[in-house]
């Protein structure tokens, strides 16, 4: 995988219709899409037309260069992200090849209208979440999309394993790219990458949290798991420290999630494992405690809505407890550049929204997405104690 934007975006190569692209790998969404060669860019604040360079895409997809593209009639793409970015366009089919696995006639979106903060490298995105999150709608005009009336289709990974091309499992080991050479870790489709990881595995169920708008049945959407709680330490600690140590060591503070009214002592909370989100999002109270644990301490900036910290501060150790085991984020990943002379905490408040375990935490953990078994597996990784193959 390729790491760009100071280790905040993770890309993988894909060939579509004979054209090669770098795409964002996102476990928090499902649609595969590319910017079309004739797309229009719109300002992220005013939504007024701007030069296409402002969307900062990599090379766009060119229909005329593909011998295998077919248009999907009477269908359109209407996709919005929590960041406020919006994509509208057409739907088509073409041959996708990723990781040596080829899927012919994969459905995907061609973006004609983009409100997008790009990275200058990626030409689009491939979502690896469940098909229930796909955003294809009836009609050629995406502006006529009706919320809750999307036509669900198989994302790329679904077609890979449903065609028996690979096992229904993939895994990710993200890296910060400490040497600045673009090495963003590894992704394995159909198994686990051959990299060093900790001695203990844990496995937990993926929690179905969505509600089907037609049947009202619970369904899988995101890779949501139950976390036991969170821990915070002013001192660096062992990567594989048990949760008991977090509770007994007076220099470590277990942090609770939202209160369960039936069990007020519970610290459990559902959290989404999302490679497409840079930061970790928890309750505002936990985010404040993490910010204040920096030395010197951070603070909440009312103007930006973020917990900011001095750029020279020493980060704490922040851990997530899953199935009784704490997985710590590398403290070096908790301090992010937020602008000139401005740094932010890698753990931010969700303002009563979703709890998300993003790249800041994922960089220290091998994450296994076992879709076939409906489970996720985790193993700790030593803090960059090995080198990537060139």
Sequence positions of predicted segments:
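Aspartic protease catalytic domain
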Residues: 113, 312-390
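N-terminal zymogen propeptides
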Residues: 1-8, 50, 138, 388-390
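Short strand-coil-strand connectors
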Residues: 15-19, 97-104, 168, 190, ...
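Extracytoplasmic, non-cytosolic globular domains
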Residues: 28, 186-195, 201, 205-207, ...
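Short hydrophobic beta-strand that contains or immediately precedes a catalytic carboxylate
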Residues: 14-16, 22-26, 32-34, 125-126, ...
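Signature of the N-terminal lobe/flap region of pepsin-like aspartyl proteases
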Residues: 4-121, 293, 315, 323-324
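Aspartyl protease catalytic domain
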Residues: 1-5, 104-262
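Conserved beta-strand elements of beta-rich interaction domains across eukaryotes
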Residues: 30, 39, 113-115, 131-133, ...
């Amino acid at each position: 995988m390729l790491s760009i934007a100071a280790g905040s975006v993770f890309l993988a190569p894909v060939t579509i219709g004979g054209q090669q692209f770098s795409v964002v790998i996102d476990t928090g969404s499902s649609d595969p899409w590319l910017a079309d060669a004739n797309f229009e860019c719109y300002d992220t604040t005013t939504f007024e037309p701007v030069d296409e360079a402002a969307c900062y895409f990599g090379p766009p997809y060119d229909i005329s260069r593909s011998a295998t593209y077919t248009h999907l009639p009477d269908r359109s793409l209407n996709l919005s992200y929590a960041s406020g970015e919006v994509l509208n366009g057409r739907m088509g089919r073409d041959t996708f090849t990723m990781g040596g696995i080829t899927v012919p006639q994969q459905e995907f979106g061609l973006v004609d209208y983009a409100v997008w903060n790009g990275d200058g490298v990626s030409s689009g995105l491939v979502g690896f979440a469940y098909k229930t999150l796909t955003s294809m709608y009836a009609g050629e005009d995406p502006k006529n999309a009706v919320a809750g009336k999307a036509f669900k289709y198989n994302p790329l990974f679904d077609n890979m394993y449903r065609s028996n091309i690979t096992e229904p499992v993939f895994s990710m080991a993200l890296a910060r790219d400490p040497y600045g050479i673009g090495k963003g870790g590894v992704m394995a489709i159909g198994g686990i990458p051959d990299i060093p990881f900790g001695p203990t595995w844990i496995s937990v169920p993926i929690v179905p949290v969505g509600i089907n708008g037609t049947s009202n049945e619970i369904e899988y959407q995101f890779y949501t798991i139950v976390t036991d709680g969170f821990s915070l330490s002013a001192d660096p600690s062992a990567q594989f420290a048990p949760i008991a140590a977090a509770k007994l060591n007076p220099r470590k503070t277990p942090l609770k999630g939202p209160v369960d009214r039936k069990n007020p002592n519970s610290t459990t909370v559902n959290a989404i494992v999302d490679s497409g989100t840079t930061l970790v999002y928890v309750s505002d109270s936990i985010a404040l405690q993490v910010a204040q644990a920096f030395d010197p301490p951070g603070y909440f900036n009312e103007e930006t809505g973020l917990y900011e910290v001095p750029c020279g501060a020493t980060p704490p150790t922040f851990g997530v407890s899953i199935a009784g085991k704490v997985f710590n984020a590398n403290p070096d990943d908790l301090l992010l550049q937020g602008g000139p002379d401005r740094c932010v905490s890698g753990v931010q408040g969700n303002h009563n929204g979703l709890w998300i375990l993003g790249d800041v935490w994922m960089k220290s953990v091998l994450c296994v997405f076992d879709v076939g078994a409906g489970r996720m597996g985790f193993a700790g990784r030593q803090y960059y104690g090995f080198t990537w193959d060139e």
